[in-house]
Amino acid sequence: MGIARILSAVLFLSVLFVVTFPTLLSADHHDGRIDTCRLPSDRGRCKASFERWYFNGTTCTKFVYGGYGGNDNRFPTEKACMERCAKA
């Protein structure tokens, strides 16, 4: 591999880092709170019936979770949901 290719790769990776680094530090991604709380409810792939809570953008709403899969916008109690997702 020639020196020109190595320098091109280093330059590309440097630019990529400079462009993406501020996004990684933004409030939307810092602790995952906003991203998690913006996800839709997802009952998962199984057919169990567990009462769980998800944040719908305004408040926490009860839904039935199937027991496997789904996403991180799923909480065991309304209180846990509000503590994670409600804006202070």
From Swiss-Prot:
Keyword entries, A-Z: Disulfide bond, Protease inhibitor, Secreted, Serine protease inhibitor, Signal
Domain of life where this protein originates: Eukaryota
Signal sequence interval, chain numbering: 1-27
InterPro entries: Kunitz_BPTI, Kunitz_BPTI_sf
Subcellular location: Secreted
GO molecular function, one term: serine-type endopeptidase inhibitor activity
Tissue specificity of this protein: Expressed by the venom gland.
One of the GO BP terms on file: envenomation resulting in negative regulation of voltage-gated potassium channel activity in another organism
Domain BPTI/Kunitz inhibitor: 37-85
Residue positions assigned to the propeptide: 28-33
SMART domains: KU
Job of this protein: Serine protease inhibitor that inhibits trypsin at a molar ratio of 1:1.
Protein name: Kunitz-type U15-theraphotoxin-Hhn1q
Species name: Cyriopagopus hainanus
